């Protein structure tokens, strides 16, 4: 999720070598909202609640909706791989 955010950060500023123009235009607020909604929708808590009617955080493999949104936002706002180092943050901030 963090790396996806980094991609969003740089996608509109990476120039095409032939034209010198960015490959993509800057994402709109609606597109960013859609990306955040997608990150939220694939959170283990959201998936478990919909599939089983309850949440068991001991079985999560990809993180909660809140965690996934937070890491996407971290990557998007920072544009830095270093900001995505999950080993460098306290476990409560994963």
Residue ranges, per PLM feature:
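Short helix/loop segments within enzyme catalytic domains
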Residues: 2-45
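Pan-zinc metallopeptidase signature
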Residues: 42-94
